[in-house]
């Protein structure tokens, strides 16, 4: 960093090299595009590259303006694996959306969240492509299995889970839980080890 000069000896470098990780875990939700005025001096930046983000006109966005870019995940997987030659683990990936609780033809409450199914399907297809590219991937987990308060916006209406929780931003709701359509879809993806994905 600017103004700091740390002397690192060869012995220090050896100790650091011996302390390498066994794998790299990371979260992936979106890609970002920045304009040409991005700050080169990080010490003058207030929000990293986000302060210069621009919309990518070639891809869709979520209700919260997050780019939906499955191919970006494949790119990131290949880039990280090529750079570090360590197994990778996707610890978070998912779509925050406004879900509508409905009653189906059998009288069961549910959410027809085809948008979430499409998002996850398309990202998992790209994960499979990255594995075919030679990326060593240890695992994949979605964010999250049940609706909860969004860490990025502090909202309950931004829902990620396979299970709907009847709770609203204003605190109303019964806290009852209902399986969304994506619940059984993802259960099938797991049972078939990805064989049920649509390419």
Model-derived regions, located:
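Non-catalytic scaffold segments within catalytic domains of secreted glycoside hydrolases
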Residues: 1-199
